[in-house]
Amino acid sequence: MTAINELAPTGKLRAGMNLGNNLFTRKNESGELLGVSVDLMQELAKRLGVSLEMVVYEQPGQVADDATKGVWDIAILAIEKTRAKTISFSPAMTEIEAGYVVHQNSTLKSTKEVDAKGVKIAAPAKAGYELYLTSALKNASIVRTKNFASSIQIFNEN
């Protein structure tokens, strides 16, 4: 099987574009997609000699949910063991370190203290961060939100 047949079986490269992480994909004021993901997909389509169709999703969980539906051929997502059941991942192109934000008066001083009863952590549902926390934490509660902005809103309200 050739790279074109494998990556673009319909004759065009259908790229799942995740707007949930502005580091990779975002829209400008006129609604045009910009970012590293866009640049990479455009270059890949060019090298394959096929057209590019960008299939846009608001959140990474939506991209992952469509992985087995034949809607997209390639996407940039966090590598996560739950997703690996239905998605074939290449080696990571980058690594993003994440941390916790706590209120100024919090008694939590290290990441080791976070996994405790009574601790609530807001994270976007089905995002790589939330999937990791779900598998790693045993005692803290995860508040799954619609998106990153909702997580910040919950943090600010509590």
What residue spans do the PLM features occupy?
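Extracytoplasmic small-molecule ligand-binding "clamshell" domains
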Residues: M1-A78, K85
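Short loop->beta-strand "edge-of-pocket" segments that line small-molecule binding or catalytic clefts
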Residues: K12-L19, L34, K112-Y129, A140-I142
